[in-house]
């Protein structure tokens, strides 16, 4: 009887240990288009009829076209810089990440680097507060992220889940810079958090997947 009792207790303890060692499954990533307006009619219009903040134009030699992006997350195409066709959605993200399903999309830039295309874009999730400046501002989660695509018109997706900058910093307006074969991201540490805004830079990995 004692042997059976000890054997039962041993099995029970081993079961508890095994249960504690089983890791909870990681949430399933859910990639989706964000920005722009799904279902928008694709049309061609003259440049002076477009309403867009923080515009950026990439002249792509491979397709012999110009690509215009700006805050809001839409893309337009043109062959002559006068007439533009769009808007197209081109940004996809994991909506289970901190970015969420409806982030603010600011100041995107498209760059070609080593035969791939990259989108430097600032996301803001107003539901996440990372800092508080007394009598001034509740600092929302805001950061520049780098997305990539094999095609200039996308879809673009995050290179990795890694943060390029501390998540407690409110950063924006990231831009690409290369010097002596070394890639960098130039960015702004926002004045709403620092009082005096700071323009800074970080060195990037050769594939732009993380900061060095």
Positions of PLM-derived features:
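Bacterial Sec-dependent N-terminal signal peptides
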Residues: 1-28
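Carbohydrate-active catalytic/glycan-binding domains of CAZyme proteins
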Residues: 19-212
């Amino acid at each position: 009887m004692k042997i059976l009792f000890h054997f039962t207790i041993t099995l029970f303890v081993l079961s508890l240990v095994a249960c504690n060692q089983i890791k909870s499954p990681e949430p399933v990533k859910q990639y989706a288009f964000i920005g722009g307006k799904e279902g928008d009619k694709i049309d061609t219009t003259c440049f002076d009829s477009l309403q867009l903040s923080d515009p950026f134009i990439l002249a792509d030699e491979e397709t012999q076209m110009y690509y215009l992006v700006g805050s809001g997350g839409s893309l337009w195409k043109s062959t002559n810089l006068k007439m533009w066709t769009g808007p197209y959605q081109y940004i996809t993200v994991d909506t289970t990440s901190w970015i969420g399903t409806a982030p603010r999309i600011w100041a995107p830039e498209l760059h070609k680097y080593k035969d791939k295309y990259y989108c430097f874009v600032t996301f803001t999730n107003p539901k996440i507060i990372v800092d508080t400046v007394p009598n001034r501002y509740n600092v929302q989660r805001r950061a520049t992220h780098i997305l990539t695509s094999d095609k200039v018109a996308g879809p673009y997706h995050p290179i990795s889940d890694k943060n390029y900058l501390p998540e407690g910093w409110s950063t924006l307006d990231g831009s690409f810079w290369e010097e002596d074969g070394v890639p960098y991201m130039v960015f702004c540490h926002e004045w709403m958090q620092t009082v005096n805004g700071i323009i800074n830079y970080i060195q990037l990995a050769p594939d732009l997947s993380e900061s060095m």
